[in-house]
Every structure is written in structure tokens, then in C-alpha cells.
Swiss-Prot record:
Entry coiled-coil feature ranges: none
GO molecular function terms attached to this record: structural constituent of ribosome
Pfam families, alphabetized: Ribosomal_S21
Keywords linked to the UniProt accession: Ribonucleoprotein, Ribosomal protein
Descriptive protein name: Small ribosomal subunit protein bS21
Keyword set includes Ribonucleoprotein: yes
HAMAP family in alphabetical order: Ribosomal_bS21 (MF_00358)
Gene of this entry: rpsU
Species of origin: Chlorobaculum parvum (strain DSM 263 / NCIMB 8327) (Chlorobium vibrioforme subsp. thiosulfatophilum)
NCBIfam families, alphabetized: S21p (TIGR00030)
Keyword S-adenosyl-L-methionine: no
Gene Ontology terms: cellular component: ribonucleoprotein complex; ribosome
Length: 65
């Protein structure tokens, strides 16, 4: 659970911004989206491999540039 304490003289906007950052860093939304529907393990592994391949290609292109 993500929680944020309000500091003295802190505006609601700043408090909300801090909460959103903590929420995003905690990975709550990412985990929720991941569990929204079932993905077969074989498909999940295939997607992970393709993501890895793309990431490696981008890194390789950046090194060559």
C-alpha cells in the first residue's frame, strides 16, 4: 500500500504529485494490468524474448551510432 504524509504548508497538488510518483515506482498499476487477464506461460515467454531482442537491438544501434 502506498501512503504519503502531508507536510506543513504543502499544497494538495504537490502532495498528489508525490503520491503519483510513489504509486508508479511501487509498480501497483503495472502489476494490476499484468493480472487483468491470463496469459499462457508459453506466450508470456515469447513476449519476454521479443522484448529482450528489441532492447538488445536498440542498445546495439546506440553503441554503433
Amino acid at each position: 500500500m502506498v501512503s504519503v504524509q502531508m507536510n506543513e504548508n504543502e499544497s494538495i497538488d504537490k502532495l498528489l504529485k508525490r503520491f503519483k510518483k510513489k504509486y508508479e515506482r511501487a509498480g501497483v498499476l503495472k502489476e494490476f494490468r499484468k493480472k487483468a487477464y491470463f496469459v499462457k506461460p508459453s506466450i508470456d515467454n515469447r513476449l519476454k524474448r521479443s522484448r529482450c531482442k528489441r532492447r538488445a537491438q536498440r542498445a546495439n544501434e546506440e553503441r554503433n551510432s
